[in-house]
Each structure stands twice: as structure tokens, then as C-alpha cells.
A protein has these predicted regions:
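P-loop NTPase catalytic nucleotide-binding module
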Residues: 2-21, 39-40, 110-251, 271-272, ...
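P-loop NTPase switch module centered on the Walker A-proximal segment
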Residues: 3-108, 114, 129, 155-157, ...
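Short, exposed interaction patches on small structured surface elements
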Residues: 160-167, 171-176, 323-338, 342
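Active-site phosphate-binding and catalytic loops of NTP-dependent enzymes
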Residues: 5-6, 36-45, 50-65, 90, ...
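Residue-level signature of catalytic and energy-coupling elements of molecular machines
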Residues: 20, 26, 60, 81-83, ...
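Short amphipathic alpha-helix segments
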Residues: 346-361
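Flexible glycine-/small-residue-rich
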Residues: 15-17, 67, 72, 83, ...
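Conserved nucleotide-binding/hydrolysis modules and their immediate coupling elements
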Residues: 230-232, 237-339, 353
Length: 365
């Protein structure tokens, strides 16, 4: 008979936040509630699931975007959850990661409200046209209430913020004000259709907000239900296409090229090509690794809406488009900090240079 219709919804979702808003705690809570991890770590105990880089663990901040995989509604929705760097000085990687997202979850600390860094992230999401959900965290601590925070969001970031934790009548009234199509249905006295709400979110007319406390696991289930209910997969091209968004190294020093598939299918051992006209590269995709935290499984093929780390591609650069996918433009966020390297006494300069080259490869400015 005909091939079975693949009804799995595959999404790449990135979590972005101001540095102390509880982003890693939310990621942990999400993975815990989705069943990916059995116990909760805490950033302050330095065993958080997504922060696998030793440099990060020592400093308690997230530098390299990590990812975790989980499923919702009985496997019908598969999510690659990318933790984007929260420090603006790691902005080129954050920007490239945002460029491969289907949806973003922006985490805001309720007591702190909208920070100037929140506005920077919002501008980045707007420029990349990423539909965005908000999780307003730390609502268990003293601070402004929901209405005051929604007012602040609208004042500082613009229209479209709707409390999805409100009762349906209040939510629908707020939704109608954000989108003409929803307004027409609302004025006609019709219940708002899920599909129309999904479309309004995809068009960035509506930004659903949930309020809660990641640490207390409050509001996390509602966010996950929202990710399953109010999303749709990106249209996928028929021919193979993928976007490289970062390059890193595994523990053994093997080069990993991270890409998001946008069309067709990527099969293990496929030959990929890229680089500028006339000076291009061609290489075999040795392994297709699906990472969740520090662990990975090997895939035979990777489909649109999935992210994988490929070994064997020595020359692929972050931002590069493969197959039918075109290259991303240059990152627009200028790094805020410049760095000077001071080597401790007795350091072998050659080893240090090799390590600096590795960092330069991973962050091609």
C-alpha cells in the first residue's frame, strides 16, 4: 500500500534569557517533566543537565549552546531544545542558533521584569522572525503581578503579549486585539479556532505568556502543553537542505558540525559540499549524532526539523547553507567584549595557540 503518512511534528525550540532569569533551571524542569531526566540538578550545585562544558560548569554560566531532546503528547511532537548562550558577548553563536529555530521560549524573571538585555534578545528574535513564547519565571518571589508585567512587556517590547494561563474568555478577548482574523471570529461570536491561533502565533502577531516558577515546577506543564498545542512544523523543502549553526569538538577532539535539516533527508555517509564557488569542499557525513546533554545516539538519517552533529566535515563553517539552503548573512549583533589573552607563566605557547585556533574555528567572527 501507500507509505504511511509521517505525522510526527518535529520542532527546534530555543530557550533565551537574561543571565539570571533561571533559564537553566527552566530547561531542567522542562526535561524533568518531559521525562528526559530522572533527577533535577541545580546550577548552584554545578550538575545541571545542559551545561556540559567544564569551562561553563566552573563559572556557572552557559557559553556553548547545548541541546536536549524530548517528546510531548505521546511522541506526536518531538522537540530539539537548544540552550542559547545567555551572555551577549557570545552573541554570534546566539544569533546563528536563533537562525535555525522554529520557536523560541524567552525566559524573563518576574521580579526583575524586562531588562535592557531582554530588549536586545527581542530585537534579535524580531529580526530572525522567530515566533516566541514567554515564560515569566520566579513568580513565587515578591514582585509585580501578572497585569503589571504584561503592561511592562507591551510598553517595552510591543503588542501581542497574551496571558495563556488566563481563563478562555479573557484569553480570547486579548487574542482578538492582536490579530484581524481572530478579531473577525471574535466579533462574529464564534469560538476562536486552534488553527487560527497557531497561525497568529506563527506570524508573530501573538506571543503566548505563561507565569510560574521553574524551581517549584509551577507553570512548566502548562508551557509544555502550549508547545504541543500552539505550534506547527516549518514547511520543508523536497530536496536536501541544511543550515550549519555551530562547530565544536567532542571529548576526543573530533570536529562536530552542528546543522539543522530544512528539507529532504540527510543520510549517514552522504557526500556534502559547500564553500565558495571554485574553492569549495566536499566531504562524507561520517556520523549523524543526536545529542541530549553530553550523550548522543547515532542516526541513520535525519529529517527536517531535526538537529544533528556531523563528524567528518572538516571545512563547513557556521552560517553556511548546505544543499538547497542558502548561507545565513553575517551576524549583526556586535560582540560587546573584546578579549586579551594573558598566558600564565610556564605555559607552552604552541599548545595555547592551537587551543586559540580551535576557539577561532568555533566562533568565526
Amino acid at each position: 500500500g501507500p507509505p504511511m503518512q509521517d505525522t510526527t511534528k518535529r520542532l527546534v525550540v530555543g530557550v533565551l534569557a537574561h543571565v539570571d532569569s533561571g533559564k537553566t533551571t527552566l530547561s531542567e524542569a522542562v526535561l524533568y517533566r518531559a521525562g528526559t531526566i530522572r533527577k533535577l540538578g541545580r546550577v548552584d550545585h554545578r550538575d545541571a543537565f545542559l551545561d556540559t562544558d567544564s569551562l561553563e560548569r566552573a563559572r556557572g554560566i552557559t557559553i556553548f549552546s547545548k541541546q536536549a531532546l524530548f517528546q510531548l503528547d505521546g511522541g506526536r511532537t518531538q522537540i530539539a531544545w537548544l540552550d542559547t548562550p545567555g551572555h551577549v558577548d557570545f552573541s554570534a553563536e546566539a544569533e546563528r542558533t536563533v537562525g535555525v529555530l522554529d520557536y523560541a521560549v524567552l525566559v524573563i524573571s518576574g521580579p526583575d521584569g524586562v531588562q535592557s538585555h531582554t530588549e536586545t534578545l527581542w530585537a534579535l528574535l524580531r529580526r530572525s522572525r522567530v515566533p516566541t513564547f514567554l515564560f515569566v519565571n520566579k513568580m513565587d518571589l515578591p514582585g509585580p503581578g501578572r497585569e503589571a508585567l504584561l503592561d511592562q512587556l507591551r510598553r517595552r517590547l510591543g503588542e501581542g503579549f497574551v496571558d495563556f494561563g488566563a481563563d478562555a474568555a479573557a484569553r480570547d478577548e486579548a487574542l482578538a486585539l492582536c490579530d484581524e482574523h481572530l478579531m473577525e471570529a471574535y466579533l462574529a461570536g464564534e469560538p476562536l479556532a486552534d488553527g487560527d491561533i497557531v497561525t497568529a502565533i506563527a506570524r508573530r502577531h501573538v506571543f503566548p505568556c505563561w507565569f510560574g516558577s521553574a524551581l517549584k515546577l509551577d507553570g512548566v506543564d502548562a508551557l509544555l502543553e502550549g508547545l504541543a498545542r500552539w505550534t506547527r512544523p516549518a514547511p520543508a523543502g523536497e530536496h536536501f537542505g541544511a543550515r550549519v549553526f555551530k562547530v565544536s569538538q567532542d571529548e576526543q577532539g573530533a570536529r562536530l558540525t552542528w546543522l539543522r535539516v530544512t528539507g529532504g533527508v540527510l543520510k549517514v555517509k552522504d557526500t556534502l559540499a559547500g564553500g565558495p564557488e571554485g574553492a569549495g569542499w566536499s566531504a562524507k557525513a561520517d556520523q549523524l549524532r543526536l545529542y541530549s546533554g553530553a550523550k548522543y545516539t547515532l542516526a541513520g538519517e535525519v529529517l527536517p526539523g531535526q538537529v544533528c552533529a556531523v563528524t567528518g566535515l572538516a571545512d563547513a563553517k557556521p552560517g553556511e547553507g548546505l544543499g538547497a539552503e542558502r548561507d545565513a548573512g553575517d551576524p549583526l549583533l556586535e560582540p560587546v567584549l573584546t578579549y586579551q589573552v594573558l598566558l600564565p607563566e610556564g605555559t607552552d605557547v604552541h599548545t595555547a595557540l592551537a587551543q586559540l585556533r580551535r576557539i577561532e574555528e568555533e566562533v568565526p567572527e
